[in-house]
């Protein structure tokens, strides 16, 4: 067997660049997760999955590593505190978690608990999120910021929540909202805590660049800010404004765009302070990105800066502008949800099968027994036997021409089905032989660089792309994917990953590779009776809540895990994935009614002796078991 090391696997999957020192490969060749960056403690993911299956927790399984979540919260706050100290910044930093990034109750509760020492807050953007935020903050005084569109009921709820002791700030997104706020504040006699969202001319970069700029969906233009100040003065509520908010989009890939936005926001803050608006907080919104592909570039799946650089620029730019303007520096708020939760969850699942030709007939034997192969088949066979490095280009082009010719002749009725099957088999053999030669040639001829797509095998995995990783399908987001095991062995298959939905879009064909974006995922040949698992990493932000019920595949099993020095890990919580009856209920089917309808029909079939009692009973038993079972595939 060809020598291969775990270091070579780490390089192939670019692990060291996207893993943020939270993932590594152990001596067994299994990928591990660490509770914090550079920690020596680790959990072997393959061993963990084996243990979970023994506990009857079936894949796909969403693994939530709560120590990683805690570490990310601590890390972001630490780098900001360091930046404050280095720049002698006279105010404080505070992080607010936008719960839209991952609204799962257990996740938000954990963030609230871990973040208490940092005075973490919650950002909400709708009435349901407001109610969730109030529930989480009850008893612990967590501050809440309300963004998004608001109606009278929303505003009144916030006002009375403020009246009974909750620390909630309403951010004004539009002037008509401010009119409602002023009206309800006067009606209830409750003075609100207010923020104003400004529409910066600065834009971000990447997929969400339109969140900033003059055409942004939210925020007040400069003329509208002046109008808002006048409205608040006339209502005697100007002193209620204590926050200025801006946001140029999620996953900002370029640090220079962030700097430009910070300067503009700080200038607006300074001018508003000079106008007598006693703003205490400058909320710079989200945008702190995640390096999904490890390229450290301005590509939309990466960022060209570190968290440390981001924090230093935030503190420096704001302090510089405020000192220049002669105004007090504000307390700084950021809403860095993606950077907080992306790393803490991993989806693991099993590979079910591949589209390899292992089950194909022995065409070599068939060819030997054929008296006179079809001319097209004969030409392909001759190429296969004679190909070498000196005839690669010509043979490759001839092969493409001949396989197209075989299809045309078949459609015209001049080739049999067996002839076409043999032609396809020979085409595959020729491409593999070319590949074995090309791998030894440097540089690879340009016209041969993309031919490897013909070698790409499809690995079918037990998951729904639309449910678990919707951004991969919707916006072509890259997420790191790699096997959990056999990483001490050379991967010998170039693969794509297909899910189990009945949709051709349910396939991943772009991957994080050694040299950037790749059309292949290196995988190992499947062994008989071996369970082969893959992991989807950095999926903690947005994926769970954006997932849909395509083909009625529901939520996966989820497990909350913490590290334990004695036992390696502890399972804190197991959240069962959706059963079939639950996903059917979403679309207005009821399990008991289904069973009754089918049973009534079966009884009629039994009565006329078309179906036996035993067959009827067994079918109902199977149907009932399916309704109660996991929506994903078993053995």
Curated annotation (Swiss-Prot):
Alphabetized PROSITE patterns for the sequence: ODR_DC_2_1, ODR_DC_2_2
Gene: speA
GO molecular function: arginine decarboxylase activity; metal ion binding
Provenance organism: Trichlorobacter lovleyi (strain ATCC BAA-1151 / DSM 17278 / SZ)
Enzyme category, top tier: lyase
Function: Catalyzes the biosynthesis of agmatine from arginine.
Family annotation (Pfam families): Arg_decarb_HB, Arg_decarbox_C, Orn_Arg_deC_N
Binding site for substrate: 282-292
Transmembrane segment boundaries: none
InterPro entries: Ala_racemase/Decarboxylase_C, Arg_decarb_HB, Arg_decarbox_C, Arg_decrbxlase, De-COase2_CS, De-COase2_N, De-COase2_pyr-phos_BS, Orn/DAP/Arg_de-COase
Residue numbers carrying N6-(pyridoxal phosphate)lysine: 100
Family stated for the protein in its record: Belongs to the Orn/Lys/Arg decarboxylase class-II family. SpeA subfamily.
Keyword Metal-binding: yes
EC numbers on record: 4.1.1.19
Keyword tags: Decarboxylase, Lyase, Magnesium, Metal-binding, Polyamine biosynthesis, Pyridoxal phosphate, Spermidine biosynthesis
Cofactor list: Mg(2+); pyridoxal 5'-phosphate
The protein's name: Biosynthetic arginine decarboxylase
Organism domain of life: Bacteria
Pathway(s): Amine and polyamine biosynthesis; agmatine biosynthesis; agmatine from L-arginine: step 1/1
Gene Ontology biological-process annotations: arginine catabolic process; putrescine biosynthetic process from arginine; spermidine biosynthetic process
């Amino acid at each position: 067997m060809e020598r291969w090391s775990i270091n070579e696997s780490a390089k192939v999957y670019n692990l060291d660049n996207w893993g943020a020192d939270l993932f590594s490969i152990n001596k067994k060749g299994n990928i591990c997760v660490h509770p914090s960056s550079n920690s020596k403690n680790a959990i072997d993911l393959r061993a963990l999955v084996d243990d979970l299956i023994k506990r009857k927790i079936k894949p796909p399984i969403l693994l939530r590593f709560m120590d990683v979540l805690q570490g990310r919260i601590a890390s972001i706050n630490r780098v900001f505190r360091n930046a404050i100290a280095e720049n002698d910044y006279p105010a404080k930093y505070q992080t607010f978690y936008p719960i839209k990034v991952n609204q799962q109750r257990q996740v938000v509760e954990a963030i609230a608990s871990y973040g208490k020492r940092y005075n973490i807050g919650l950002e909400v953007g709708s009435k349901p999120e407001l109610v969730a935020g109030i529930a989480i903050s009850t008893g612990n005084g967590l501050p809440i910021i309300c963004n998004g569109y608001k109606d009278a009921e929303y505003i009144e709820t916030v006002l009375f929540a403020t009246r009974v002791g909750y620390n909630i700030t309403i951010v004004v997104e539009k002037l008509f909202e401010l009119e409602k706020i002023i009206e309800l504040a006067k009606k209830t006699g409750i003075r609100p805590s207010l923020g104003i969202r400004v529409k910066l001319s600065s834009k971000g970069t990447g997929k969400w660049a339109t969140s900033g700029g003059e055409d942004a969906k939210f925020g007040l233009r400069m003329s509208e800010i002046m109008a808002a100040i006048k409205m608040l003065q006339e209502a005697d509520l100007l002193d209620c404004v204590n926050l200025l908010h801006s946001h140029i989009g999620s996953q900002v890939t370029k640090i220079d765009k962030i700097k430009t936005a910070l300067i503009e926001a700080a200038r607006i803050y300074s001018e508003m302070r000079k106008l007598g608006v006693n703003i205490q907080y400058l909320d710079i919104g989200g945008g702190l990105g995640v390096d999904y592909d490890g390229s450290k570039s301005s590509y939309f799946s990466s960022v060209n800066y570190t968290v440390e650089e981001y924090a230093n620029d935030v503190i420096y730019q704001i302090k510089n502008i405020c000192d220049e303007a002669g105004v007090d520096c504000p307390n700084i708020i950021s809403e860095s949800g993606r950077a907080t939760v992306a790393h803490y969850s991993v989806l693991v699942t099993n590979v079910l099968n591949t589209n390899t030709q292992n089950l194909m007939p022995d065409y070599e034997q068939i060819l030997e027994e054929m008296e006179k192969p079809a001319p097209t088949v004969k030409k392909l066979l001759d190429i296969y036997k004679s190909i070498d490095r000196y005839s690669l280009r010509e043979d490759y082009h001839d092969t493409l021409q001949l396989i197209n010719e075989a299809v045309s002749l078949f459609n015209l009725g001049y080739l049999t089905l067996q002839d076409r099957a043999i032609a396809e088999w020979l085409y595959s053999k020729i491409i593999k032989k070319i590949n074995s030669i090309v791998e030894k040639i440097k540089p690879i001829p340009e016209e041969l660089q993309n031919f490897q797509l013909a070698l790409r095998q499809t690995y079918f995995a037990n998951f729904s792309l639309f449910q678990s990783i919707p951004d991969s399908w919707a916006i072509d987001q890259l997420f790191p994917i790699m096997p959990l095991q056999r990483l001490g062995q050379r991967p010998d298959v170039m693969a794509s990953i297909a899910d189990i939905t009945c949709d051709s879009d349910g396939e991943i064909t772009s991957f994080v590779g050694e040299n950037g974006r790749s059309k292949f995922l290196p995988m190992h040949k499947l062994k008989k009776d071996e369970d082969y698992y893959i992991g989807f990493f950095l999926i903690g932000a947005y994926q769970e809540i954006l997932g849909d019920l395509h083909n009625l595949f529901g939520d996966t099993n989820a497990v909350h895990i913490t590290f334990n020095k004695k036992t390696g890990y502890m399972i804190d919580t197991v959240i069962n994935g959706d059963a079939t009856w639950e996903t059917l209920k979403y679309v207005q089917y009821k399990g008991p009614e289904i069973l009754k309808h089918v049973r009534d029909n079966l009884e009629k079939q039994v009565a006329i002796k078309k179906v036996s009692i035993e067959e009827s009973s067994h079918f109902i038993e199977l149907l009932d078991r399916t309704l109660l079972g996991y929506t994903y595939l078993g053995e």
